[in-house]
Amino acid sequence: EKNLNDDAARFCNDYLITRKLTRETIKKFRLGYSSNKDSSLFDFLKSKNYVEDDLLRSNIVKLDKNKKIRDFFYKRLIFPIFNSYGKVVGFGGRSLDGSNPKYINSPESNIFQKRNILYNLNLAKNFARKKNNLLICEGYMDVISLNQKGITSVVAPLGTSLTEEQLNLSWKYCSKPTIMFDGDVAG
């Protein structure tokens, strides 16, 4: 989140402006930016005495092909992914420079299994249950944009398809969720 205030994040902020996101929305969804340096998070955590092996196991850093530790996400808009209890369990990252893949998620782990998580369920679940209404849209930016327009009972799968587990999860909060995916190719 702090990196969004850096000069290096100007490109990211320009993207958020083109998407017409307000500062309040950016804060609400705790959006961030991963630095242009491929090891800035690793270097910061090492300075705080975190152990390399623990950081590697956490999947927020990885070994590159030259066996150098680097941040898993860098030069990306960052979307924290929360479980239904509001705890961060992973991250999504969107490239802003045209590189592929456009979106990446944290690697699967014991606490992050994307097939079992709906983005924004932590914020949408109470309204969904109260109104028996849940909209499942395609991605992070769809959720955030709709939420900013006042549609708060909205979630998204963490990938190009809705899993059976995610559909079952939605039924815990709404008897008939509405699925509204884009008409274009996923991504």
Report the location of each language-model feature.
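Non-catalytic accessory segments of DNA primases and related replication-initiation nucleases
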Residues: 1-53, 106
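Phosphate-handling DNA/RNA-contact segment within nucleic-acid enzymes
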Residues: 35-177
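Phosphate/diphosphate-binding loops
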Residues: 182-186
